[in-house]
Regions:
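Short, charged beta-turn/beta-strand-edge "cap" motif at the junction between a beta-strand
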Residues: 115-118, 143, 256-258, 378-382, ...
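Histidine-anchored nucleotide/phosphate-binding helix
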Residues: 392, 453-467
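C-terminal edge-of-domain segments
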Residues: 1-52, 121-227, 242-246, 258-261, ...
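Short, structured beta-strand-loop surface elements
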Residues: 64-68, 73-80, 84-134, 206, ...
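Short, well-ordered loop/turn sites that connect or cap secondary structure elements
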Residues: 103-105, 184, 243, 367, ...
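A structural micro-motif recognizing beta-strand termini
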Residues: 91-94, 231-234, 290-292, 356-362, ...
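A short, Trp-centered hydrophobic/proline-enriched beta-strand micro-motif
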Residues: 53-60, 108-113, 187-198, 249-251, ...
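Ferredoxin-reductase
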Residues: 329-424, 428, 435, 441, ...
């Protein structure tokens, strides 16, 4: 009986979401999971959550078909849920907001409630059921929670009464100016709105708005094109699924200190693989956004936020400078390169760890958990350098090469006796097929003995990073 019901209940995912889930091998699992966690009503916990928020992220589509992301704000309590299928918002877009005329009765909207000081967030997709001079009522289509990854904590305060109109300088353009590029370059957070009209039917339109975070500077700027790494997430692919079928998107960058809002609309392209993806630590794919229009509203937000802590997930990701250095290192992959010992750590009476850094100005080579590092070391009394392989005991996200060596054998004993900070050695790019697929969710038992624990440590570290 239950199996028959699963067959007739519509999938919680649309075609674009399913296609990306299939691409990464999680479609069947996510079909079951989605039916459990995506609801057509607000659970009581979500209703209470929205009531305590001072802001709400909104995604919608303007009359020209361009999506925009924006924000509504108010004292906690400005959002209410009179019943589980309705969210009431007592706020409207402020002067100059591209969504000022888009949030009318019948309009599809995406909402994101985010509590920055706790990293909690919940999402809602629905339709504006009613609109008046004071705000909106939104009928729930889908409601679901999101994980707290990549959210930097911030504490909020109000610089003025959010209900009062503030004089706002409004600027706009079609090509990013210096101020816009500076705001984006400094950002560790932004929000993206996307939408899809299934089979071209506007009446079935669905809009999403979601959060993106990383280290400051994780958005690369090339003229009017932004490149954003896409990190491991909840595998819903709501945003990327929309972009796969409809490349239009709207971005919102908030200056948390000044209340300035920078809103962009434009088109996107998803990059699923390639050297750029592989070289950016933590990226599972990339996407590019080309600006078509922008609006900047200085001081539009009454809220101000004080930075708290970095998300641990953000700190595990790379940077564009690191990615560039890694690509340079990849071009040298088949060559012996000069390295130096940067640090020596006494792990036990018989094991020392050696931290290695490139001495040629190029970056660290890419590697996967479980691979080994070929070394070439010249020893006194030997005409030719000796070759040895040592398992890398650092995780790929550690931004270092570390080998942990037991004092046993000719080269290993020499490293213990003579390896010190500044000692020069040669290494080639990491090699080996021994490893574990961190994307597969199934129990794993790692067995090792003695110094053989080194590949297990890096595999366990990698699995922990990805929450497996």
């Amino acid at each position: 009986m239950d199996e028959q019901r699963v067959d007739i209940v519509p999938s919680p995912w649309h075609e674009g979401e399913r296609r990306i889930q299939q691409r990464v091998g999680v479609a069947d699992r996510m079909e079951v999971f989605g039916r459990k966690v995506i609801r057509d009503f607000l659970p009581e916990q979500h209703r209470a959550f929205y009531r305590q928020l001072p802001l709400l992220l909104v995604g919608a589509v303007d009359p020209a078909g361009d999506p925009w992301a924006s924000v509504l704000e108010g004292q906690p309590g400005f959002i209410d849920s009179p019943d589980p299928r309705l969210l009431a918002i007592r706020a409207r877009p402020t002067a100059g907001d591209p969504l000022a005329n888009a949030l009318e009765a019948g309009a599809a909207v995406g909402l994101l409630g985010i509590e920055l000081h706790t990293r909690r967030r919940n999402r809602l997709n629905g339709t504006v059921a009613a609109a008046d001079a004071h705000g909106y009522s939104v009928a729930v289509g889908h409601a679901f929670g999101n994980c707290p990854q990549y959210i930097q904590t911030r504490d909020y305060s109000f610089a003025r009464d959010p209900a009062s109109a503030a004089p706002t300088a409004i600027e706009s353009g079609t090509s990013l100016d210096a101020a816009g590029r500076a705001a984006i370059a400094a950002a560790d957070t932004f929000f993206i709105a996307s939408y899809l009209d299934p089979e071209g039917e506007r009446a079935r339109r669905g809009v999403d708005v979601s959060h993106r975070g990383g280290k400051a500077g994780f958005v690369r700027i090339d003229g009017d094109t932004l490149t954003i790494p896409d990190f491991a997430g909840n595998l819903h692919f709501n945003t990327l699924g929309n972009l796969l079928l409809n490349p239009r998107a709207g971005l919102l960058f908030i200056d948390f200190a000044s209340g300035d809002l920078l809103q962009l609309t434009g088109s996107t392209e998803i990059v699923f693989d390639g050297d750029e993806v592989r070289s950016f630590q933590g990226a599972e794919r990339l996407w590019r956004f080309t600006v078509r229009a922008w609006v900047r509203r200085r001081g539009a937000l009454a809220l101000r936020f004080a930075f708290g802590e970095w998300s641990p997930n953000s700190l595990l990701t790379g940077s564009w400078d690191q990615a560039s250095a890694r690509r340079a290192a990849e071009s040298l992959r088949s060559r012996w390169r000069p390295f130096r010992i940067a640090r020596v750590v006494e792990e036990s009476a018989v094991v020392r760890s050696f931290h290695l850094e490139p001495a040629d100005g190029a970056g660290l080579p890419l590697f996967t958990a479980g691979q080994h590092l070929p070394l070439r070391i010249g020893l006194p009394g030997h005409e030719r350098p000796l070759l040895r392989n040592y398992t890398i005991s650092a995780a790929p996200s550690d931004d270092l090469l570390r080998i942990s060596v037991k004092r046993d054998g000719l080269v290993s004993s020499w490293l213990h006796a003579h390896g010190a900070e500044g000692t020069a050695i040669e290494a080639r790019a990491p090699e080996g097929d021994f490893g574990i697929d961190p994307t597969i969710k199934r129990p794993a038992v790692l067995l090792s003995a003695g110094i053989g624990i080194t590949p297990m440590l890096t595999m366990a570290h990698r699995l922990h990073e990805l929450g497996r």
